[in-house]
């Protein structure tokens, strides 16, 4: 608590106030100096939170000296605006405004380490501004006490005034420990000044006391004579019944009309004890028949006057201390907000924006989970009814195998529609997604995980898939050989390489111009194994081309197909290990089984688009498809055993559109594969795994 350290005898304008000292106005004749001790605002002796202090030091270091100086200045409007919002007591608000105005005029360092400028601006001392630890203690240790202090002040429910500014506090109350508290907080100089009683003030208290208790004329005259003896106007030796012991400890100054009271604590307590019945409301007979009784009444009035004075000092001290604390904490809070706003401007984002961003992120994650659940339920309902009706050509054993594969969502039966006698090799795979449609050509293997595809890949192949990878890395550029979607589109080269379909090493996937260009360059290295092998490959290509051309004649009558509402997904897959004969496909027409591959490619654009649409409109005039380019790369002359670098560069220069649209091709294949996986999520474990991986990415 603040202490009373001095008395302003010549006026407060001439007194040299030190730091944290303010004048305390008691009455017209008394003004004391009020001082706040250093331990109230100790900036070095607190144990701070290490993590918060480290963060504050980092934020403090972000600001330049100029920015820090600007941040550590607030105007009086900001302080008084916060005052009107936080403090409900009108007496407290007026006291804070009065004290702030006094400090602006006088310039006293009453709020150190805060300073008040002549223009009404509030700032911090230079030593505290440059020391991050002191500034942190000021902002987050002392500054955090503002709301607690305001909430701790008792307030009236009627007018929201605090007890110190309520009208009831001006009335003297029964004696308690308040006078002792304020007596202990006074210096010796202040005590001597308090017990110096002005005779005119004592006479006013005495007259009020006589009127209140309605003394008779004789008794009133006796009391007044005892008062005149005390102030030295009458000679005590001439008064009969005068007791000098009653006035012991009292000394008068007739010329200055002062009464000096002994400032010993015991004597003050005894003197105030005489006035206690008056404040307690006790009734006693008020008579002064003799002069000694009149002396006791004078001592009672002296005790009343002294108690009222001490009570007034205690009230002023408490009110001014509360006013000083409010102004100090309001200034610290305003400076802290200014500092944080400056730091937020430097950082570019505020704490409120961070909080909103966190809420938005949580909402986004929640919506994503709900969308995944809805999509999962939608796919489950869409693929709920799946049936596989066996053809008449299937045997009883094959029907059992087909039912088992339907349960596991994998079909591995041989292709009877094509008339092929080779187990595990199929020409046409039809996937029926409607329960009313029948499979015209049972699948012989899983499209993605079939052993035929795995068998066809060379041991040196990296499993590239034209920029689309089902692995977590997803960084491999691919060849059409590893892509089942390319098989669906009819642009794969499975039939072009036979047993060695992946004849090159796709090592630098993303760094190369295109993996297929390197395929064409490296595919010639295998020509050194012999000319006979190359001739065989060439004959295979010719047979495959004839096979594709003859497939148009194998299309069955549209009347044999199911209704237009049924959706059929057909995957055309060529044999990679054995020669494919055109007659094998056409035999299905003789057997009575329809082969609607060509017509289905026209009716289902999402799974079978022409090769030209895959490459987009930017492929350029005269640009060849990948199938034709691959055919040309295989159908080289017997004498040519390698491709020179000039030819490679020439090819890359002539096919710039392919490289410019490379990302479009990848995205197109990725979308196709996603559609395929969504439709076959219940059948293919790899499809569900890919959808989970793609959703996470």
UniProtKB/Swiss-Prot annotation:
Gene Ontology CC annotation, any one: cytoplasm
Modified residues (Phosphoserine): 360
Broad class of where this protein is predominantly found: cytoplasm
Protein name per the record: Gametogenetin-binding protein 2
Cited function: May be involved in spermatogenesis.
InterPro entries membership: GGNBP2
Other comments on record: Strongly down-regulated in 40% of primary laryngeal carcinoma and in 6 of 10 various cancer cell lines.
Tissue: Expressed in heart, brain, placenta, lung, liver, skeletal muscle, kidney and pancreas. Expressed more abundantly in heart, pancreas and skeletal muscle.
Keywords in alphabetical order: Cytoplasmic vesicle, Developmental protein, Differentiation, Phosphoprotein, Spermatogenesis
Organismal lineage: Eukaryota, Metazoa, Chordata, Craniata, Vertebrata
UniProt record, GO biological process: cell differentiation; labyrinthine layer blood vessel development; negative regulation of cell population proliferation; negative regulation of gene expression; negative regulation of receptor signaling pathway via STAT; spermatogenesis
